[in-house]
Amino acid sequence: MRVAGAAKLVVAVAVFLLTFYVISQVFEIKMDASLGSLFARSALDSAIRSTKPPRYKCGISKACPEKHFAFKMASGAANVVGPKICLEDNVLMSGVKNNVGRGINVALVNGKTGDVIDTKYFDMWGGDVAPFIEFLKTIQDGTVVLMATYDDGATKLTEEARRLIAELGSTSITSLGFRDNWVFCGGKGIKTKSPFEQHIKNNKDTNKYEGWPEVVEMEGCIPQKQD
């Protein structure tokens, strides 16, 4: 009886050890597979991150150098989609912000700090040009001025208004016509003509939309005003 009992004990221990061994092997295989999947997924995520193109402020195509403000802007599309003005990854004016309108849309920015001073739009089709002229006269030296048309930005413009905008560095303002698309970035006190200006004429033979030219876009880096 003692021999039979001992034999049963030996068998039970052997079965236990065998079961433990099998379970440990299966667990180890699963663990290896899980770790392998984890490392493979991490490597894939790293590869995706390394191949993803970098995003620059306002979505411009390349980074601006130090002491420059990144900007991107677009005119309105016909009389349907309003213009958009972005500076340093901050959308200053857009249809989503509900602060744009028919005519000339203007954003004023401190040329030293990049802080927004004011945003306004002036109706140059059914409005009065006088408030626009007074607004232009109040702009202080060192202010960055960004302008974009929507629908029609020229019908009510007078020679005085055009002259004041030209003093901000614009070249195309003298020829801006009915329903032309135009974007401009200049500054009060600028000594030369601004390199940041795009203008597309309203031409029935080349217009993208019925009665309006295509949207005009522009991006760049504005030098920060130094003391």
From Swiss-Prot:
Residues 67-225 form the GG-type lectin domain. The keyword Ion transport does not apply. One of its GO terms (molecular function) is cytokine activity. It is found in: Secreted; Cytoplasmic vesicle. This is Protein FAM3C. One of its GO terms (cellular component) is extracellular space. May be involved in retinal laminar formation. Promotes epithelial to mesenchymal transition. The gene is Fam3c.
